[in-house]
């Protein structure tokens, strides 16, 4: 993973958010989408963010990406995402030749571990990556 993508992933994972308290992630998305050329977006009353890029001819369809902006872990004011040791072998003892795996973990500023909501926030990350990669996305 190149540094630009890794930095974006760490940035998305570091946004503190929780169910019904998604304002931080919504604002993060607005800031990122404002900087993306040719992307139009709006936010509805429920804080859902809808973004599109490009135009289609009649009968064509956008690829569409959907992700959650909330997580279920305890909300903390700041999440520090750190790269930890590369994981090899996996937790079941399997090895994959010479492959190594990056581990990202979240901590509070005082060093306590915290959830990063990676299952939801990785969807946000992927949606942003698709907006960068494709001409027509919704």
Model feature map: region roles:
Residues 17-60:
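A non-catalytic alpha/beta surface segment that caps or lines the substrate-entry region
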Residues 60-138:
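Active-site metal-coordination/substrate-binding segment of hydrolases
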Residues 1-20:
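N-terminal capping segment at the start of a domain
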Residues 6, 10, 30, 124-132:
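Predominant activation on well-ordered alpha-helical scaffold segments within soluble catalytic domains
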